[in-house]
Amino acid sequence: MKPIAIQPASLTFNNEGTPVSRDFDDVYFSNDDGLEETRYVFLDGNQLPERFMTHPRDSFIVAESGFGTGLNFLTLWQAFAAFRDAHPDATLQRLHFISFEKFPLTPADLKSAHAHWPELAPWAQQLQAQWPMALPGCQRLVLDGGRVTLDLWLGDINELVDTLDDTHNRQVDAWFLDGFAPSKNPEMWTPGLFTAMARLARPGGTLATFTSAGFVRRGLIEAGFDVVKRKGFGRKREMLTGALSHDAPPPARAPWYARRPASGDKDVAVVGGGIASALLALGLLRRGWQVTLYCEDDAPAQGASGNRQGALYPLLSHHDAALAAFFPAAFTFARRLYDALPVSFDKDWCGVTQLGWDEKSQTKINQMLDLALPDTLAHGVDAREVRERCGVKTGCGGIEYPQGGWLCPAQLTAGVLELAQAHGLRVHYGHRVSALHREDLDWQLDFANGAQARHAAVVLANGHQLSGFPQTEKLPVYPVGGQVSHIPTTPGLGALRQVLCYDGYLTPQNPANAMHCIGASYHRGVSEMRYQEEDQQRNRQRLIDCLPAASWAQEVDVSAGDARCGVRCATRDHLPMVGNAPDYAATLRDYATLSQDASAPETVMPAPVLKNLFVLGALGSRGLCSAPLAAEILASQMSGEPLPLDGATLAALNPNRLWVRKLLKGRAAS
C-alpha cells in the first residue's frame, strides 16, 4: 500500500501581515480587508445569513474548495452564532461545514493568521484547540458543543471528491468556491470539480466565488448551475454567484453498500450499556433525537467497557487500506472528543510504546513506520529512547504513539451517560431485550422481565450479544473472552511512565489507587468468562517472556487474584460494524448474480436492510479508539448527514461487507 503524506503549507507573511503562499505566490486573503471580502463574496453571495431564518431543516450544510486559514469558516460560524442567539427556537439548529485543503497550515501559522481578526478570536481559539494532524482524508471536528461540525478533508480536492460516498450527494446548501486564483492554481479549477459540486449540491443549492474567469463560468454552467456575474469586492470588477438548476439525482456508485438514514419519528431505543452506546446516545441527543437506553445490567459498563485502565492507541496496518484509513482517523477523533467532554474520568495521555520484542514484531513495526504518518501520531524509537521515555529498561525498540495513553473506561462510560441524561436521555437498567419484532411502523422490544416498549428505530450496541437476535444471527462476529489482572505498584513498576504494548500490555500506575493493569488473555469463541488463575499467571509470564532483559518485570505480583473478566465482540477483519442491520435472506436473494451485475451499478438494487434497525459493535479490543468515531458515523447516518470517511472505508465498516465481498467474487455468502 502506497502511503500518502500530507505536506504543510509553505508560507510567509508580507508587509501587511497577510499570509502568502510560497508555492502559489498568492495571498490567502485580501490585503485590504479579508474579513469584509469574505462577508461580501461568500456570505452575501449565498444570501447568508438571511437564508438561515427560512431554512426548513435542522442543519445547514456548506462546502468549500479551499480551507486555507479558515477565514471563511470562522466568519460564517460567527454569523451562525449570532443567528442562533437571536433565534434560539428556529428550525435551524446546527451548521455543518465541509472543506478541502491540500496544504494545511501548521498550528503556529494558523494562530499567526488568526491574529489578524480579534473579533473572531472566540471561534478561532476553538478551531486552534482542535486543529488536526496532517492526515490524509477527513478529520471531523465537533465544535461549539456539537452545534458546529467541521469536516476537513486533507488532500487534493479533485481526487477527494470522487472518494466521497453517496451520503454526500444532494446535501450541500451552499458552495464557497475559493482557493488561490485560477491563474496561480489552474490544477484545482477543473470541469471534474464543477461536476462534483453539482452532484453534491441540493436542488437549488447556491454557489459564490471571487473569480469571474470565463472558463470557470462556462464550466459551472455546463455542470448544471445557473450562473450570474455581480460586482466584485473592492477593486475587483466582477465575481460569480449561481444556483443548481436541475433536480436529477446522481446514480449510486456502490449500491450494495448503500446506507440509509432512519425514517419517521426521531425516537430511538439504544440497546447496550458500554462506551459505544453512551457516545451514540449523546450524539443523537445533540441532533434532536429522543433516546432511550436499555441495559440488561443494573449499572453501566458491566461488559467490555468496565475495565479500570484501558490503552488508547491506533491499530496500524501496512497491508489493509481500510484499517490504515480508519484507525488513525478514529484515534485522532477520540482524542479530540475525550479532551472536549465535560466529564471527569481518570486518564493520562502519557504516550504508548508498542515494542518490537522479537523479529516478527519488529518487522510489523517497520511496516507501520512505512505508512509515513506524522511524527505526532507515530514514530520509531530505539531501545535507548524507549528507556528514556518509558522510564524502564526493555532491551528493545518499537513505535511510539506520543498522544496515546490510558483512561478509565468504566468512569468514562458512566460520565458520558450522566451527561446524556442531563440532555434528556432516558435509561432503564435491568432490562434485557429477549425479542425484537416489527409492529406497524415501529419496532417492539420484549424484555425478559415481561415489559414491552415500542420505538421508531432501534440500535443494537450490546457488545458480544450483537448477534443474539434472529435479525442479526447471521452477522459474522464472534466473542472473545479475556481477563485483565490488577497488580500493585512496586519501586520497579512505579518507574514506568508510558503504556507498554508487547504480546500483551502494561499500564503505568493509576495515582488514584497505586495499581497497574496487565493483560489480557484471549479466548476466541468464549462468551462467558470467569476468573482463571491460569490466565492470571499467563498475563505475568507474557511480560517476562517478551522482555527477558527487564528485571523489573519480575516484580509483577498477581497472587492477590485481583482481576476483571470480560467478553469482546470481534470480526475477522478487525473493523467494527457500523450501519444498517442487513437483511440476510434478501441479500442472498437479490444479490445472487452480483458478480455479473456489479459492472453496471446503476441497475443494482440498494443493499437490502431491515428498516430502522441499526448495529454498532464488533469493536474488538480497540473500542476506546474506535467507539467515538463509529458512534459519530452512525449518529450522522441515522440523521441523514454527510459522513466523515471516504466511501471505501465506510464500505469496510458496513455490517453486510463480508457477505457482499463473497458475492462480488461469485462465491456463496454463507
From Swiss-Prot:
GO biological process, alphabetically ordered: methylation; tRNA wobble uridine modification
Cofactors that this protein relies on: FAD
Key words, A-Z: Cytoplasm, FAD, Flavoprotein, Methyltransferase, Multifunctional enzyme, Oxidoreductase, S-adenosyl-L-methionine, Transferase, tRNA processing
Annotated localization: Cytoplasm
Region feature FAD-dependent cmnm(5)s(2)U34 oxidoreductase, mapped onto this chain: 271-670
NCBIfam families: MnmC_Cterm, PRK01747.1-1, PRK01747.1-2, PRK01747.1-3, PRK01747.1-5, tRNA_MNMC2
Physiological role: Catalyzes the last two steps in the biosynthesis of 5-methylaminomethyl-2-thiouridine (mnm(5)s(2)U) at the wobble position (U34) in tRNA. Catalyzes the FAD-dependent demodification of cmnm(5)s(2)U34 to nm(5)s(2)U34, followed by the transfer of a methyl group from S-adenosyl-L-methionine to nm(5)s(2)U34, to form mnm(5)s(2)U34.
Protein name (record): tRNA 5-methylaminomethyl-2-thiouridine biosynthesis bifunctional protein MnmC
